[in-house]
Amino acid sequence: MTGIFLVAIIAVISVSDLISIDSINWPAELKQSICDQLQITLVFDRYKSLYVIAASICTVTTFPSDIKNHVLPYIRQRTDFDSMMNARLLAIAAYIIVTMITGFLLAGVFLNPFMTIETRGSSLYGIFQPLMNSKAAWIYLVLMSFNLAMSIIPVCYLAAAVAILKPDEYVAVGAGFFVFYLLFYFTGSLPWILSYSSLTSEPGRASVGEVIY
């Protein structure tokens, strides 16, 4: 539950400057779109790095904790190393996916009185454009968070490898943060469709290097 609330809080904070008490009574056509604004925040690295940190805190830090508490020898008595690692990596992936999707949906529920889930249905949403001017836009919010989760999973895997070599919780979280920025900046010069920024921001049409405003 900690990870879900962390993700939801980050998502709400990322668009907090666009919400006000007065907006609750505004007509839907005057409200900002939750999907539009959350997608804008995912184009840049400011809040995306916080999602990586949240995922690392709840997953990668278990490796140094288990090593320090000598838990691994007891696990290996019941299973072999490969099975143990495969199960752990699968658990990390499943946790991140569930946490990101549930956290974004929770943020959407909180933001819904101040904003609207529907959007203009911009062509930047690609094949999902028909969904965006109806309540079905919640589906896109799920896809957006799933897309983000899939991009964070390999970052956490690399951070886990560092955490095994250097069993320290702070190193584990820092490794995830460092790996994220390496990917973010070193892929920045690649074509948009191949950049890490694109892969983590626009599941509808990742090849378009534009931001929805």
Where are these regions (language model features)?
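Extracellular/periplasmic helix-loop-helix junctions in multi-pass membrane proteins
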Residues: 186-211
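Hydrophobic alpha-helical transmembrane segments in multi-pass membrane proteins
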Residues: 12-13, 101-102, 183-191
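Short basic/hydrophobic patches in alpha-helices and adjacent helix-turn junctions
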Residues: 161-164, 180, 184
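Helix-loop-helix units of permease transmembrane domains in multi-pass membrane transporters
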Residues: 61-94
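Secretory targeting signals
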Residues: 5-61, 86-165, 202-213
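Central hydrophobic cores of alpha-helical transmembrane segments
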Residues: 2-9, 169-183
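Short loop-to-helix capping motifs
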Residues: 1, 78-81, 167-169
